[in-house]
Structure formats: structure tokens, C-alpha cells
Amino acid sequence: MTVPAPSQLDLRQEVHDAARRARVAARRLASLPTTVKDRALHAAADELLAHRDQILAANAEDLNAAREADTPAAMLDRLSLNPQRVDGIAAGLRQVAGLRDPVGEVLRGYTLPNGLQLRQQRVPLGVVGMIYEGRPNVTVDAFGLTLKSGNAALLRGSSSAAKSNEALVAVLRTALVGLELPADAVQLLSAADRATVTHLIQARGLVDVVIPRGGAGLIEAVVRDAQVPTIETGVGNCHVYVHQAADLDVAERILLNSKTRRPSVCNAAETLLVDAAIAETALPRLLAALQHAGVTVHLDPDEADLRREYLSLDIAVAVVDGVDAAIAHINEYGTGHTEAIVTTNLDAAQRFTEQIDAAAVMVNASTAFTDGEQFGFGAEIGISTQKLHARGPMGLPELTSTKWIAWGAGHTRPA
């Protein structure tokens, strides 16, 4: 057995100590009234606005370091904060305060023939670990959603956003202390050492679930090495399939919106599939529209292209021989995120929705709609691409588990 170096032992102890503090905080949060949680969210929003200059100064340090490291423009944009973005982050907390509290919701209840009353109701998960890349807004989003759902958050952000995250979490903790709530409801783990991630995802018995949010490499590493339950989020090799019965005006609008609205997010389209029956007329038009929008088109894509999540103004293009071939292609190369078909044929649409294995399937609609707010249930902590415990946009209910409660009157079970 390899004995860890003292520094690693210290780091593991640091993570475990933080998790234990989070468990203590989570026990209190689990029984907080909704009004108190909402008051805390509004207080946190107020603190963010009051300390906006401090937050922006910290973010400027991160941005300067990122520029010196030749960080790509798309990543700089995700890292960047400005007054408007801070205002938006604060507004997001107020929005969460306005959402329905899932804790205590009764999912089902009934009385047994013997008079024993049973009910199943939602309860918090407990301690939620979040591992994410250089997006400071995720720090506050995670805090808001975990607090409202009665959970404590252990956050491990990217080293590229370390200063920003430290400033944000300090402000959030100040808001909690001001209301005599446990500051350890939100804690930021060190991003200076990658081993922090390992210790977090292996803290079985201390951490109830870990949610990785980032690129494919991050998510695969977490799922591979974790000893605590994980919820996979994010990786989106999304397809737009233009069926032979498609309205090409509609197809062009959906394709451009799916690809170009925000190319760096996980619900952006990465592959265009065109039905062979209309390829001769549809392809030139769709390719011209993409190129006019500044999209680099990858014709004759190889295996790597077909599996790539570009997260940029790039798209792979392939021709398929009918709806069954499109379904087979997507189920082979897709990541189970969001898939779209454009067609006026109801049978083809029905076949597509039934046989595509994905968290969301769109019929004559953009892949960009896979989003908690767009789905009508508010903010999300990520988009799950797995089937257990949650699938699709993860809002407040997905940050809960359930418990059964039985009310009796001296009931005993017969031998």
C-alpha cells in the first residue's frame, strides 16, 4: 500500500473536515422554513450588489492571469464578470427565492387497510459537492439552488476562477452569518491542487452526491474515480436531423439557432444530419446559411469529428438514408443530451421521439430549449445526461431525495 505524502494527508483531512462541517450545516438547513431560506437568498443578493466592486476586482485578477496564459476567447468570456453580469447573478438568487420549495412536498400518500397512514415526501440530499470549470456564476447558482432545497454545498471551482470564487463565497457566507444561519452551508475547497477533487469524490459517508459540470474530460474523470454517487451533466454532442419531409425554411431557422445562438454551451448543435432523399437540394442551402453565419463546416467527418463536442462555431455534417439511419447514427454518436428532428411527417417524428435515447428530444424546435428556465421550472444546477437519479435539466426537485413516513396508533405487524 502506498502511503500518501504528508501534504496529501493534510489535504484529505482538510476536505473531510469541510465535509463534516457541511453535514452539520445540512442538518439545520433540512428543517429551515421556506421563508427563512428565501430571506437568506435575498440577503445574499443584496450582499453581492453591495460588494460588486470587490467581486469585479477579484475577477480582474483572474482575467489578467488567464490572458497571460493565452486562454481562448470563449473561455475568457465564461470567466469574465462585469457589473451587468453581477446584477444578473444577484437577480438569479431572487428568482430562486420565488420558486416553489420542494422540501416536504408529498409525492403520494394513502391509508393501508389496517389503518396505518403512509406518505412519501421530498427531503434534501444532504451534502452536495460541485466540481466545475472557470465559470464564477456557477458558484452562486449552486449556492442558491442547494440552499433553497435544504442542502449544504461543497464547491470546487477551477483555479482559473479562484480569486472570483473566493470573493463570491465570502460574500455569500457573510449573508448567512447576518441571519444567524450556518456559514458552512457553502464552502469553497482549494483549487490549487487537483487532489482536492479526488478527496472530494472519494469522501464516501461524508458527501451525499457529487455533480461535475464541465468538459468531457472532467466528467469522465469524476465518474471513473468517484466513490460517492455522481450525477453526470453537460457533455452535449447534439444533432439536428433534417428529415425528407422537412420544411426547409423551418429547418434553416432551427439549425442556425441550435448552432449559433450560444455555441459554447452544452445544448448547442454539433452535428447536422440531412436525409439523403433531399440532400441534393437541402445541403447547399443549409451549408450556405451556416457559412454565412460564420460556422466552419466539417464535411466527410471522421470518427473523431462525429464524437466531438466542438463548443465553437464548428459543425460536422453527414447524410443519412432515412429516419432509421438517423436514429442509429444519433444513438451511436450522441451523448444522451438533446436531439432534434425537423419534419412535417408525424409518423417520422413519433418514431424519432420513441427511439432516440436522450434526456430531451425536440420536434421542430431548437436544441437550445433544453434549459431549466426555458422548461418553465426556473434555475438549474446542470443538465443530467444519465438516467439515475435525475435526467435532463436539474432544478430544485432534482436536488432532493424522498423518505417514507408512517403514522400509526400502536400498530404492530402480525407474525
UniProtKB/Swiss-Prot annotation:
E.C. numbers: 1.2.1.41
Record localization: Cytoplasm
Gene3D superfamilies from the UniProt entry: Aldehyde Dehydrogenase, Chain A, domain 1, Aldehyde Dehydrogenase, Chain A, domain 2
Family the UniProt entry places it in: Belongs to the gamma-glutamyl phosphate reductase family.
GO cellular component: cytosol; plasma membrane
Protein name: Gamma-glutamyl phosphate reductase
NCBIfam families assigned to the protein according to its UniProt record, in alphabetical order: PRK00197.1, proA
